[in-house]
Amino acid sequence: MVQPEDREDGAAVDVILKGKRQMKRKYGVVDYLRKHYPPPEGSGEVEVEFLEGYDSIEGPDGSMGFGVFVPTEEKIYIADDLPGGEESMIETVAHEWKHWLQYCNDEAYDEEEAEDFARQIAEEFL
């Protein structure tokens, strides 16, 4: 499978997988965030993994959610079978992306800020 970071042009990844347009949109939002909301200079990259067949994920603190950013791995995990469809997936990716940016900036995690950012990205992207 082609990974988003393998693309030189920053375009959404065209992956043919069961004919799903959703696959392109999933990686498209990651590409969009990488291009328009990068981390501060000197920060590493974050990996985004979509967990097929999951409708929720347990975070390191034991709480359940649709996605989680794990700082020790610099990785975002997103449940792939979310209620609410595409908009919910985009908001979840953006929410966790914001937590990653907060981490990169040594800021405390702010749920309200992450939710506002998620809604903003959904409006921009859809």
What does each model-found stretch correspond to?
Residues 76-92:
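Short pre-active-site segment immediately N-terminal to the catalytic Zn-binding motif
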Residues 25, 86, 90, 110, ...:
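Hydrophobic (often cysteine-bearing) scaffold residues that line and stabilize catalytic clefts
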Residues 107-126:
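Post-HExxH zinc-binding segment in Zn-dependent metallohydrolases
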Residues 7-10, 14-77, 126:
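Auxiliary, metal-adjacent structural segments of Zn-dependent hydrolase domains
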Residues 91-103:
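Active-site recognition of the HExxH zinc-binding catalytic motif
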Residues 83-84, 105-108:
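Acidic-and-aromatic substrate-binding clefts and catalytic sites of carbohydrate-active enzymes
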